[in-house]
């Protein structure tokens, strides 16, 4: 199976051994961040630092001044990695080590953008804004995201891209000193708290024949037993989550939300993919980080499998965990694949972040039986030496057919 490792530019810039170390894992490709959200990242082998703090979402290359001149929404530049173009410097080093470089572009996830432009943020049923989550129904947000996708994806030398958060973002977010766990929000509760009631979304609901204010009140009513501790609004698996949403809201109201959000997300994906392809040379591969439950949001956006595979060249799917986790996400895409479709199983290989590098060979083999033809490894820069040793062993087993 073809394998690619996720990498940040700061893992490579300033470390002359990094590119060769990654190539020696046995991967054929790296997925290198070109536009990324704020984070605090470990760099356990870098000669100059151990922690990198990316203070806000930024592009890791020099943005095109002409593209963004005079626009209110535009990408921020980074200042925490030395040099004007850390992406380009890292990409060159990785390519010199024999690795194929693809870009990693985070789109609808940008806390600084929402803080500085509060009108663009998702606004929940209570009127609270989520600055990390730009509302993808808003025309100015869509224009920004589509142009960012084209610019950040098609970097010099890149052979393809992976678009993360190309759709709705909502409540779920690794926020600063988070303290929202007082009421257990299951999947259905997360969905209700992620529904947007900004002006654009309100107009969208009205356009479907619904009363936006009545919908908002219905969401507030549905969540009352959650805050009272009477229900966790869970639902279990993906199908159970949606059944719980319909139970809490009523099927008709749930259908309005689904129709609006699915339409918005699908059209954004289509526009972003088209913009990337227009900016790229032929055979430039466009993948989307995705989840087969359309109601889900976040880094792995919820999609309809048939719809997304008609738009993009493939998907990257969350496959960390046991066999049940993989069985839930891979099979829904298999009937809709073509000969060129990529179904990439994404595995966390950092033990401290919930990964299991020791079982990677077995887990990847299971994913292959379910239809995956590539794997992704999160993350070559964050993993410990011990974790990387386990990855090397696993990739050797997979390449020689010894994985069970």
Q: Where in the sequence are the language-model features?
A:
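The substrate-binding groove and active-site-proximal loops of carbohydrate-active enzymes
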Residues: 2-12, 65-84, 128-143, 254-264, ...
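Active-site-adjacent "subsite" loops/lids of carbohydrate-active enzymes
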Residues: 6, 102-154
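Short, acidic/polar
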Residues: 10-24, 139-152, 294-310, 326-330, ...
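Catalytic domains of carbohydrate-active enzymes, especially glycoside hydrolases
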Residues: 16-43, 151-160, 305-317, 369-374
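Glycine-rich, aromatic-flanked loop segments that form ligand/cofactor-binding clefts
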Residues: 31-56, 83-127, 160-170
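Polysaccharide-binding and catalytic clefts of secreted carbohydrate-active enzymes
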Residues: 129-275, 290-292, 298-305
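Substrate-binding cleft/loops of secretory-pathway carbohydrate-active enzymes
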Residues: 171, 278-324
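Substrate-binding cleft of secreted/luminal carbohydrate-active enzymes
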Residues: 312-313, 317-327, 346-404
């Amino acid at each position: 199976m073809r394998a690619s490792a996720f990498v940040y530019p700061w893992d490579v810039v300033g470390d002359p051994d990094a590119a060769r170390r990654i190539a020696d894992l046995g991967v054929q490709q790296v997925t290198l961040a070109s536009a990324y959200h704020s984070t605090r990242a470990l760099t356990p082998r870098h000669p100059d630092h151990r922690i990198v703090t990316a203070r806000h979402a930024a592009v890791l290359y020099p943005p095109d001044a002409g593209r963004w001149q005079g626009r209110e929404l535009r990408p921020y530049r980074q200042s925490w990695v030395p040099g004007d173009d850390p992406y380009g410097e890292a990409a060159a080093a990785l390519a010199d080590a024999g690795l194929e470089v693809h870009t990693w572009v985070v789109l609808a996830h940008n806390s600084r953008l929402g803080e500085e432009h509060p009108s663009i943020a998702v606004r929940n049923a209570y009127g609270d804004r989520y600055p990390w989550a730009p509302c993808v129904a808003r025309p100015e947000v869509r224009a920004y995201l589509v142009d960012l996708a084209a610019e950040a994806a098609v970097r010099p030398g890149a052979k393809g891209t992976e678009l993360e958060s190309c759709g709705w973002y909502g409540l779920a977010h690794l926020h600063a000193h988070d303290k929202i766990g007082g009421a257990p929000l299951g999947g259905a509760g997360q969905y209700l708290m992620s529904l947007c009631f900004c002006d654009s979304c309100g107009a969208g609901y009205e356009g479907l024949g619904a009363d936006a204010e009545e919908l908002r009140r219905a969401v507030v009513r549905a969540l009352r037993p959650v805050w009272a501790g009477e229900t966790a609004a869970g639902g279990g698996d993906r199908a159970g989550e949606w059944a719980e949403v319909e139970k809490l809201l009523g099927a008709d109201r749930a259908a309005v939300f689904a129709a609006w959000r699915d339409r918005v997300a699908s059209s954004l994906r289509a526009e972003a993919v088209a913009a990337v392809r227009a900016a790229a040379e032929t055979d430039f591969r466009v993948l989307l980080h995705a989840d087969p439950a359309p109601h889900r949001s976040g880094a792995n956006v919820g999609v309809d499998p048939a719809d997304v595979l008609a738009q993009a060249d493939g998907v990257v799917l969350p496959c960390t965990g046991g066999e049940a986790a993989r069985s839930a996400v891979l099979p829904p895409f298999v009937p809709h694949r073509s000969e060129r479709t990529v179904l990439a199983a994404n595995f966390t290989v950092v033990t401290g972040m919930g990964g299991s590098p020791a079982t990677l060979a077995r887990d990847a083999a299971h994913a292959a039986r379910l239809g995956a033809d590539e794997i992704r490894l999160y993350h070559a820069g964050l993993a410990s030496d011990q974790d990387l040793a386990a990855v090397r062993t696993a990739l050797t087993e997979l390449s020689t057919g010894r994985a069970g």
